[in-house]
Regions:
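Cytosolic juxtamembrane N-terminal segment immediately preceding the first transmembrane helix
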Residues: 1-32
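Helix-loop boundary and gating motifs at the non-cytosolic
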Residues: 20-24, 36-43
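Extracellular/periplasmic helix-loop-helix junction of adjacent transmembrane segments
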Residues: 40-77
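Intracellular juxtamembrane helix-capping segments at the cytosolic ends
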Residues: 45, 126, 132-149
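Helix-to-loop junctions at the C-terminal end of transmembrane segments
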Residues: 77-91
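Primarily marks hydrophobic transmembrane alpha-helices of the MFS/SLC 12-helix fold
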Residues: 92-95, 121
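C-terminal ends and interior cores of transmembrane alpha-helices
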Residues: 100-115
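Paired small-residue
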Residues: 105, 116-127
Length: 151
């Protein structure tokens, strides 16, 4: 798999249609853009145990509201460091790491919700997922700039 992701193996054939690249980039942005829907998660998170009404052990809104800003901070940090790394390893490797972080962050955050461990929600969705978001923003932009230097 490492060979498939290496920078040397991402050269497209001469007859490759470059208009496939924006379609793939939009698909990536649609996936990672779901982070901006965080506000729909907040009310149900305050009723994890109580389901219909808030139970005594449920999280407060003030406890879960900071998950989104944590994700955005780590988005910025990851994007800042990813630019140089992308130049070294190529956009394909960065995209795969993005998918693993974003998907893995969702899974860890989900485990935190099921087990009622707030720190897992922050770690998964906020930190790991946020890093995946940052990587996800850098890779398509870099690829589009290279495929469309005339635009």
């Amino acid at each position: 798999m490492g060979n498939l992701l290496s920078k040397e193996n991402i050269i497209a054939p001469a007859d490759y249609n470059r208009w496939r690249v924006p379609v793939a980039s939009v698909a990536i942005y649609l996936c990672i853009g779901s982070v901006y829907g965080w506000s729909i998660y907040k009310p149900p998170l305050t009723r994890v145990l109580g389901v219909v009404t808030t139970a005594a052990d449920d999280w407060n809104l003030s406890e879960v509201v900071w998950v989104f800003p944590v994700a955005i901070v780590f988005l910025g940090l990851a994007a800042a460091f990813a630019g140089k790394w992308l130049e070294q390893v190529g956009p394909r490797m960065v995209g795969v790491v993005c998918a693993c972080c974003w998907g893995g962050g969702y899974v860890i955050g989900g485990i935190g919700i099921v087990t009622h461990q707030l720190w897992l929600l922050y770690l998964g969705y906020g930190v790991i997922g946020g890093c995946g978001l940052g990587l996800g923003y850098v890779s398509p932009v870099s690829t589009l700039i290279r495929w469309f230097p005339d635009r």
